Amino acid sequence: SMFPFSSDWHISYRDHFSYAKEINRLKEAYKDKIEILLGYECDYVAGVSCPTKEQYPEEVRPDYLIGAVHYVPWEKGYLGVDTFFDKAREQINGVFKGDVKKAVQEYFACEREMLRDGDFQILAHCDLVKIQNSKKAPYPLFDENEGWYRDSIRETADAIAKSGVCVEINTGAIARGKLGVPYPSLEMLEMLHAKNVPITLSSDAHSTEHIDYAFDQAVELAKKAGYTEFMYISGGRSLMQKF
């Protein structure tokens, strides 16, 4: 999405209109063969950007919106959650005075704020911060088995259930060789299942060859957590499909 700012990984304001125009052209051209939807992944940055459909002009308004947290602002700086390990470590040292626990807790706090204030249908990679425990990292940034971390995902699972959004099982980090498992973790997915939170499948593809990457692994994880169906959007409605 063009919000909150223009960068290599945010579409520019100018290009947003041509992108939406092309998607809407393809919708019409292929309407007898496939249903095409216009959707964006929009960043939540406290005080800067919140994923809501109303912020988009009518000609680029999406059929659905995915809410995501990639940036954790704190005092005079921010943590880029999905950045390289060394950069994240540097930002935590500078912005959070080296307090990894505080940085991770603030990430989940930002996610809960977005769930409270946003207007979107799907929550993106809801434990993205574990990317810093990547198999490409020199060492894990934190221990996902510690009580404070499990408390954070439990509190966030409660907020997700209260908000009514759908959670994606996201295989993007597998495709890009950073993790061996999808987002979210099995433990968090089990919490979500217990609260009747619907799920959907997402490859978070950055290239066409990854469009359905590791979906078999995502389905296996979903079933292990107790899920038997997933959500998809069609005709402006959220529908359920058995695996």
What is each model feature region?
Residues 22-32, 54-63, 115-119, 155-164, ...:
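Acidic (Asp/Glu)-rich catalytic clusters
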Residues 2-3, 64-160, 166-169, 173-176:
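Divalent metal-binding pocket/active-site signature
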Residues 35-39, 63-66, 121-123, 164-168, ...:
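Structural preference for beta-strand elements that scaffold enzyme active sites
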Residues 34-45, 78-91, 118, 168-175, ...:
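Short secondary-structure transition/capping segments
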